Amino acid sequence: MKTVTFEIFRYDPDKDKEPYYQTYQVELRRPGYLMLDALNQIKWELDPTLTYRRSCREGVCGSDGLNVNGVNMLSCMTKVEDLGTEHIVVQPLPGMNVMRDLVVDVDDFFAKFITVKPYLIRKSPNPDKEIYQSPEDRKKLDGLYECIACGCCSSSCPSYWADKKYLGPNAFLRAWRYLADSRDEGADERLPILNDKHGVWRCHTIYNCVEACPKELNPTEAIMNIRKMLLDTEI
């Protein structure tokens, strides 16, 4: 049975003056052993004080984003063996305040998400039946609606780290999901928000967000589409 060394970021603000790293030896007990399996093994068998988020175990809830060997990923979608190393460094998502160990404060992240009004806005009178959307228009939403708000994209972005008011790639992807929706009539409300100095123009097209997304979505493309809409629209 293969053993892998895990070096994990630890910090309890109630008792620690500074963060530190703690090392654990983890057994890979079956093929396809996940990062989440390894963290569970540590917590359940070695150190019950280790704190991290988890929920669905199926890449749906988005709660278990981590930084592993310098790359943001979901613990429930990452096989330990795929990392190709026997020494794994696990840290909280960068650019976010650490609450304890691997748990970060996501309040600001979701506040920025809400800022772009991530819901359908209708100005026309409600019709007597559902609002029709053609298959072609529905197809335009592929690659947009699948976001699970895990934070891997925004926390990989240098602009997000440097500018605490920058909305970030997650918010922009969500904004474009509705701007691209043929049923939505809220562009006049969203575009001024996105055109702000902390909006889409602060993106430097580094593409970290694209590399980090566990759902293989493209926030940078969404940002470019929003920029084009801004240039084509008088606001």
Show which residues each predicted segment covers.
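Eukaryote-biased recognition of intrinsically disordered, low-complexity regulatory segments
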Residues: 2-24
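Short, contiguous acidic and Ser/Thr-rich linear segments
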Residues: 22-33
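Short strand-turn-strand beta-turns centered on an Asx-Gly dipeptide
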Residues: 27, 67-70
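Ferredoxin-type iron-sulfur electron-transfer modules in oxidoreductases and energy-metabolism complexes
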Residues: 32-48, 91-235
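Short, structured protein-protein interaction patches enriched in aromatics and acidic/basic residues
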Residues: 56-65
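A generic structural motif
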Residues: 79-80
